Structures are given as C-alpha cells and as structure tokens.
C-alpha cells in the first residue's frame, strides 16, 4: 500500500477529487468536498464527491466501514460538505465511467464525517443545466461549484499568472496605481466617490490607469504593468460590465515597433503556456484595409465573405440609389456574398432588413440566385445586362448565393456590411476553427461626433499622431492618422494601445481641437501637462482585456462566465442587491441628500 501524499499540510484532505487514477489503486486517502449525487443500491451506497478539481465516486459498504460511515451515507443529501477516509480501488470494466477523469477508480470508504448540512439548492450543481442566468447570478456561490465555472476561474488564474510571469521575466515592474483619483472623463461617465473630509469634492474610480501610467514613465519606471480594475459608468450593452479587469502595460524610450514587438513576445509566451500557439510576428492590417475588406476594425479573418467594391459598375445605373452613391464623393456601392443563403425563403430573406437596420441601414437591397438558376430580387429589374454580368463576375456568383448590398458613405456602408457578414456567418454556421490573432493599426486620430457636433478622439486624447500627419491636423483633422494598434482575437478587440503625446504644447493643441478651452484643459489635465514639461520620454503602451481574452480561451458565450461575481446587463448584483439605498446618516456624512 502506497503512502498517503499530502498535497498541503494545512488541509483536511490528502488528495483532491480530480487527481486519483488507476495507478493510485491501494492508496489510503482522505477526501473532502460536496455530495454531488447519491445512489442507494440496497446493500451498497454510491456517492459522487465533488471539489474544485473534479469528481470521485465513493462506495459505502457496511462490511468495510467503521459502522457509522454507512449510516452517515444513508442520511447524506446533495451539497452536504463531508470528509471521508478510504482506500482507492479499481472499478470493474463494466462500471468504468469514461466521462470522468477518475472513472477507472472509486474509494471504498471506511470513515465519513458530515461537516455541515445544506438546504435543497435552487438548481442542480452540474454542467448543462437549463437554469436561467438570473437564478445562477442570484446564487452565484452555488453556480461557481459547477465544474464548468470552476474550470473557467482556474483558466483565468492560470492565464493571469502566465502573463504576469512573462512580463516579470522581461523586466517589467508591477506598480499599483490609486483606485481613488481625479475625475478625468475618458468617453464614459465616471463613478464618483464623495469625500467626507472635503465636503463638495469628489474622487472618481479610474476608467483606466492611463494618466497614471504615463506619469510613471515620466517618473522613470520605464517598463510598467498592472492587473488593473477599471470602472466605467456607461450605458451597458449585452456583454459589458461596469467594472472589468485589464492587463495594463506601458514602456518608455521606445517607438511603436519596439512596443508591438515586446507585446508579441509577452502574449505569445502567455498564450503558449495555455496551450495556444500565437505565431509571431503577427499580421498587421491597416485600419482602412480592415474596414474595406471585412467591415470591421476587429475582423475575424477565419472565414471569407469579404466586402467587394462595386462602385464603378453602377456609376451609370438606372437604379438611382446605387447611381447616386456611385457618383457622390466619399460614397460607395459594396456587397457581400453569403453562399448558401440564396436558397432561403423570401420571408426569411426579408427579415434581414431588420438585422441590417441595427447596423445603421435604412433598408437592405439583395439578390437571391436560386439553385435552379432563377433570380429573386426586388431590384434586379433596374439592372442592365452588362451590370448583371459584371456583378456576377466580381462577386463570383454561383447558384445558391445571396448577394447583399450597401450604398452610401464609405464608413457606414462598411459597417453595415460588416455587421451583416458577422450575422450571416452565424446564421450559416460557418466554421471558425482555432484562434485568429492580428494587429489592426493606423486608426484615424479623430472622428466626427454628430450628436455633439464636434471632433472626438478615436482612441483617447493622449494618442500621438503619425509623424506624417502632424502638419495636417488643424487643416483636416479627419484625415490624420494615429500611432495606434489594436490586438484582435477571433473577431473581438482583445486589447488596444498606442504611442503617447509626450510634449506639453502638442497635448494642449490636441485638447483644444477636441473642444477644450485652455482653462478646462488645465483644470482636468493640468497635472499631466505640467509633468510633460519635465523631460517626458517617448512612451507607448497597451491594455489587454483580461475578461474578454479568458472568455475566448474558454469558449464561453459571455464575459460573465469568466468573472466570479459579475453584474447583470442593467448593472445589478442579483446576489447582494447592489446598487442599494444608503441611510440618511451616511449621506449626511458626505454632505449629500437625495433630491
């Protein structure tokens, strides 16, 4: 009989429920965990014991126990935490459970101890349950016991450790920045925290450590990282959280290639430790190439359905919508070919207009090329034979294809077709195997905010313009490019970064272009501008969305599945009831009252 191997001298168990194998047969073990299932077969009782590492089957036989063990087994119920002692033995060939890593063995239990009891759980603690997400979030501490959720947390822990080690091994210094800072809105609203000691003044929870990490570069840290909590009080979309985690990185005395190459090393190392190969150097795709080809600045390049420019074909078309766009400066006529969707029923195709409207379209023009060679479309009657022939050739049309069009401003047309491309890939269940990594670079420096009637920073107001575009910023801001790079993984923006402005005068000019008065710029960012005057070095950085990357690595549908205690889409914590009211006394302490 082998010796019991303690996994931790400060633990009640000697083995976990996920590690015992055939080679452990004959070993005495002590296990702890929760009763997952219990089956009474008359003279024998079987119990599946679960801990964070897995499940082991226990066998209770009155002839091989201390007398109380079998009696305890008769009373045990799901989710009771217990401690047992026993001997590992092999299961018979006919009783081996191939679904479990421990399926070749069981533990013949000679002693059992109930550590606590449990009320009946609101759902079964196992994978594949059909319980609503709200119920799972209400009882999140139970949901976390499920193997799938525990595996997600384990992967997140392992990946965080891997990227920390990869950074540490490359001389990056982990530095913590404050969670109570000055309110400097970066696009979303700040979560503000009233000061009790200074009535009427407020801290803000940081949307990112952006300004602080730039100050660390001024301070000489040179290579910084932090696994940082970030907070944004924005209108929540389906898969956004008011607080999230990013791996925040900054470097100084570097150019853009230095930063990107260092990041590739770090990311390739960290992903490699997770068993995911990330070939380096990564592809670099220009922003406009991504938009014009895929309709997205975060393209999934694992499948085709590329956007195709048809502007020249319809310059003289009798279909006025296309002809107008083809002859208007800055507008285009483009299309995608969804192969296989041409066989869809007319009613199903008509519903795609509603999908397109969510991406900004006022309607959706389409042509269905049926398998029998016929054509179904409300617009084809306006096309000449020459236009149809050119369309067929350029779109590589085959029977069964569905061609969908967008006509109008270039960027809007790209975004509409990019959204439809993604929708159709899901609807047609196009396979996307493996992981897809690339950089998207050279984003515009600004975009026009139609609501505010003002320029807005495409990334953030501290981004360095490309050297060749500095001179044109004031004359034509929308034509200026930026020293930016987004890390794209499987069609998601997994991270983003850029080079920073390290000159105080240029930073002030940038803020003025964004509508800041000099007084407002000094009020919000004066401390940064002052720091830049003290020999600020060239600097650039990056932030990796830890939640998003872990979602992709686990194959989860939502970032909520890789967070221990997430909020709902409305920002609520269903478990604790947050956000909640506070007492009048608490409000009085910080000189506030409810209106």
Where in the sequence are the language-model features?
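Class II aminoacyl-tRNA synthetase catalytic cores and aaRS-like
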Residues: 1-595
């Amino acid at each position: 009989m082998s010796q019991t191997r303690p996994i931790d001298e400060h633990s009640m168990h000697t083995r976990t429920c996920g590690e015992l194998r055939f080679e452990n047969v004959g070993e005495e073990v002590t296990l702890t965990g929760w009763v997952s299932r219990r089956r009474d077969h008359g003279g024998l009782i079987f119990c599946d014991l679960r801990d964070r590492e897995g499940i082991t089957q226990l066998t209770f036989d009155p002839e091989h126990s201390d007398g109380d063990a079998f009696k305890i087994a008769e009373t045990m119920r799901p989710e009771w935490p217990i401690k047992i002692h026993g001997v590992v033995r092999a299961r018979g060939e006919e009783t081996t459970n191939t679904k479990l890593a421990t399926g070749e063995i069981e533990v013949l239990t000679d002693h059992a101890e109930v550590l606590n009891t449990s009320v009946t759980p609101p759902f079964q603690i196992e994978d594949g349950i059909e319980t609503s997400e709200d119920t799972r979030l209400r009882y999140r501490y139970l949901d976390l016991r499920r193997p799938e959720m525990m595996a997600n947390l384990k992967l997140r822990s392992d990946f965080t450790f891997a990227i920390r080690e990869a950074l540490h091994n490359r001389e990056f210094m982990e530095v913590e920045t404050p969670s109570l800072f000055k309110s400097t809105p970066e696009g979303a609203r700040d979560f503000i925290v009233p000061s009790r000691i200074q009535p009427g003044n407020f801290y803000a929870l940081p949307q990112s450590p952006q300004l602080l990490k730039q100050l660390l570069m001024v301070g000489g840290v040179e290579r910084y990282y932090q696994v940082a909590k970030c907070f944004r009080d924005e209108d929540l979309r389906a898969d956004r959280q008011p607080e999230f985690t990013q791996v925040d990185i900054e470097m100084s005395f570097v150019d853009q290639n230095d930063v990107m190459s260092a990041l590739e090393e770090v990311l390739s190392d960290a992903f490699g430790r997770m068993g995911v190969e990330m070939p380096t150097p990564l592809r670099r795709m220009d922003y406009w190439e991504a938009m014009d080809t895929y309709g997205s600045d975060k393209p999934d390049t694992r499948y085709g359905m590329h956007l195709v420019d048809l502007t020249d074909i319809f310059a003289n078309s009798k279909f006025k919508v296309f002809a107008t766009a083809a002859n208007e400066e800055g507008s285009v006529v483009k299309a995608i070919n969804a192969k296989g969707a041409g066989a869809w029923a007319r009613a199903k195709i008509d519903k795609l207009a509603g999908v397109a409207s969510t991406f900004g379209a006022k309607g959706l023009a389409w042509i269905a090329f049926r398998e029998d060679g016929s054509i179904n479309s409300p617009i084809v009657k306006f096309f000449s034979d020459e236009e149809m022939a050119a369309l067929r050739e350029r779109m590589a049309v085959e029977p069964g294809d569905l061609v969908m069009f967008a006509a109008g401003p270039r960027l809007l047309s790209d975004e509409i077709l990019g959204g439809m491309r993604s929708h159709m890939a899901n609807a047609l269940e196009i396979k996307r195997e493996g992981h897809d990594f690339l950089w998207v670079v050279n984003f515009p420096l600004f975009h026009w905010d139609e609501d505010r009637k003002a320029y807005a920073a495409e990334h953030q107001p501290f981004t360095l313009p490309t050297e060749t575009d500095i001179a044109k910023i004031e004359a034509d801001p929308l034509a200026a490019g930026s020293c930016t790079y987004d890390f794209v993984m499987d069609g998601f923006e997994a991270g983003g970064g850029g080079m920073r402005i390290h000159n105080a005068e240029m930073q002030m000019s940038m803020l003025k272009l964004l509508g800041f008065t000099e007084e407002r710029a000094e009020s919000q960012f004066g401390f940064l501008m002052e720091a830049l005057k003290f020999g600020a070095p060239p600097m650039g950085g990056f932030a990796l969305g830890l939640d998003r990357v872990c979602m992709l690595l686990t194959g989860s549908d939502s970032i909520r599945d890789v967070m221990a205690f997430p909020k709902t889409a409305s920002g609520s914590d269903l478990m604790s009831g947050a956000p909640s009211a506070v007492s009048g006394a608490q409000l009085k302490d910080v000189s506030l009252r409810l209106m």
